[in-house]
């Protein structure tokens, strides 16, 4: 257990901060500043180790920084299941993984790992998803392949069909990994966030190519123990039902 990290206290501090805010800064800006202060203070004790779906530059990496600030030691993992193993095995203090996208729906790898793993959901963070088409080259007409995570391909399917209908679409385990594929070939493009363009030195061929402007992804924070209540908490319930008529009704009846 990480004694010096108290997410329940942080949540109360953030609520008080927003309640007392009369401007000129927006609540989100104040919370971001305080998050960085807390993150820096925690690092003076010992930097938190947080496993995330990597490599650096993924949306999960961005969600980690939004939730924990800039000072934790990020541990990039190749697969969602690896994040769970890092937390379960105490290799990392915490983990963060995507669980649901407003367009693509649930992330099945996360649900599968939740059903078999022994970790707790201790927090959540939602971030807007803005997809960019990135490449080493600068000519959209020269692109022959597009690498991206399957969720990104789904979320940009209309744009891809209209603008790159004849190119080969190749799935990767993360959008940042897709960006690394685009680094060495001007005829290859990747779908990723703007941060990935900076990290991997790529040009933005097209901005905001997602099919819906309301595209967002919810991430869950994983830990080995349930933290104290903050006064603004949620409970997650996961269950499976048999494939027969009335099974879902029977389960929901327990909660009614």
For the regions a protein language model found, what residue spans apply to each?
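Domain-level signature for soluble enzymes in the chorismate/prephenate branch of the shikimate pathway
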Residues: 1-256
């Amino acid at each position: 257990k990480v004694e010096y990290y108290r997410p329940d206290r942080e949540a109360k501090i953030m609520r008080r901060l927003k309640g007392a805010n009369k401007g000129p800064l927006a609540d989100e800006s104040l919370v971001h500043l305080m998050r960085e202060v807390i993150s820096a203070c925690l690092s003076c004790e010992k930097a938190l180790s947080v496993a995330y779906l990597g490599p650096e530059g993924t949306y999960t990496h961005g969600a980690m920084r939004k939730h924990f600030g800039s000072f934790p030691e990020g541990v990039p993992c190749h697969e969602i299941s690896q994040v769970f193993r890092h937390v379960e095995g105490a290799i990392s203090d915490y983990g963060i993984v995507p669980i649901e996208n407003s367009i693509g729906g649930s992330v099945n790898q996360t649900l599968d790992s939740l059903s078999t793993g022994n970790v707790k959901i201790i927090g959540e963070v939602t971030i807007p998803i803005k997809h960019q088409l990135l490449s080493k080259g600068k000519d959209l007409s020269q692109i022959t392949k597009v690498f991206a995570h399957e969720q990104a391909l789904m979320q940009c399917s209309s744009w891809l069909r209209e603008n790159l209908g004849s190119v080969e679409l190749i799935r990767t385990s993360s959008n940042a990994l897709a960006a690394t594929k685009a680094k060495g070939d001007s005829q290859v493009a990747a779908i990723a966030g703007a941060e990935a363009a900076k990290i991997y030195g790529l040009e933005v061929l097209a901005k905001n190519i997602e099919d819906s402007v309301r595209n967002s992804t919810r991430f869950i924070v994983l830990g080995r123990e349930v933290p104290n209540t903050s006064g603004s908490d949620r409970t997650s319930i996961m269950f499976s039902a048999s494939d027969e008529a009335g099974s879902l009704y029977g389960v929901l009846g327990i909660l009614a």
